[in-house]
From Swiss-Prot:
Similarity comment text for this entry: Belongs to the neurotoxin 12 (Hwtx-2) family. 02 (Hwtx-2) subfamily.
GO CC terms of this entry: extracellular region; host cell postsynaptic membrane
Database matches in SUPFAM superfamilies: omega toxin-like
Superkingdom of the organism of origin: Eukaryota
Protein name from the UniProt record: U4-theraphotoxin-Hhn1a
Length: 84
């Protein structure tokens, strides 16, 4: 009976430690890859501005609004680039 209880507690402890280590590894990988948050915010702002200005210029020229293609997982919707 004691051996079974010790085995169960050991497995639970290993599971908790493994889960914690996996979460920490994932967080560290996310922080290392890509751009800092401030640069991402600037890129997002540029994409929104870029798409809406493109459509407004085309409308003023009495042409149909051909939405500017957004790249890298973004699409133009309601004159704005939105993440797909």
């Amino acid at each position: 009976m004691k051996v079974t209880l010790i085995a169960i507690l050991t497995c639970a402890a290993v599971l908790v430690l493994h889960t914690t280590a996996a979460e920490e590894l994932e967080e560290s990988q996310l922080m290392e890859v890509g751009m800092p948050d401030t640069e991402l915010a600037a890129v997002d702002g540029e994409r929104l501005f870029e798409c809406s200005v493109s459509c407004e210029i085309e409308k003023e020229g009495n042409k149909d609004c051909k939405k500017k293609k957004c790249k890298g997982g973004w699409k133009c919707k309601f004159n704005m680039c939105v993440k797909v």
